[in-house]
Amino acid sequence: MLNFLSAKVGEALYDHQWDAKRNAEGTKTVDLFDGFDTITEKEITAKTISVANGNMVNVDPSTINSTNAVEVLKTIYRAADPHLRRLKTQMFVTPSIYDAYCDDYKTTTGAIPYNTQFKQTFVEGSENRCEIVPLSNKAGSKYIHLTTKQNMLVGVCQEGDDESVAVEKHEAFRLLFVMTMFYGVEFETISKERLLVAGKVTA
């Protein structure tokens, strides 16, 4: 039972890895920490992620569909800093954008877009350096993130007595599952050499 409940907590944390927004008064998983999209929004507001800084490109993901997805994702990739383009990267997208890319690619070329050997889909023209990664927990996101795996940090505390899992009985026929833990996400760096965000730029 503990394993099952712990797994459900893990699923909830994963579901909100992007859209979580820290609210000290909240009681839901989405209130526990700032997710990657929330961090991105704060950095855009602070102008540390911007077109001028080279770590953002003005592309509205909501405009991507099955007739333009290939060209738009190529445009995003080509806007990345040369240092970033030299690295093995991932382009994190919503499932709908991935589906649009696959449909557009097949319509345009008559072929499937993914590498049959590795079952991975790469941005056309990236020489298999930029993998398109659809994430169910990114559905509805206003951003596309192009970066390296190493730049996406997930932090937990696994030492000491600060984390605990327990089942407590406070009244008849009722058990409480109590978990105390530390959890958070962050970009290792938002420099243009490691990160490019695609999103709609507002004045």
Please place each PLM-identified region on the residue numbering:
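Alpha-helical scaffold segments that mediate packing/assembly in large oligomeric complexes
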Residues: 1-75
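Short low-polarity hydrophobic stretches
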Residues: 5, 91-94, 132, 177
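Short glycine-rich, low-complexity/disordered patches
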Residues: 15-23, 85-89, 115-117
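A glycine-rich phosphate-binding loop feature that marks nucleotide/adenosyl-phosphate handling sites
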Residues: 22-26, 90-97
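Sequence/fold signature of self-assembling virion shell proteins
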Residues: 33-67, 86, 98-203
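Non-catalytic alpha-helical scaffold/packing segments enriched in small hydrophobic residues
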Residues: 72-76, 97-100
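Short, basic/hydrophobic alpha-helical segments
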Residues: 74-87
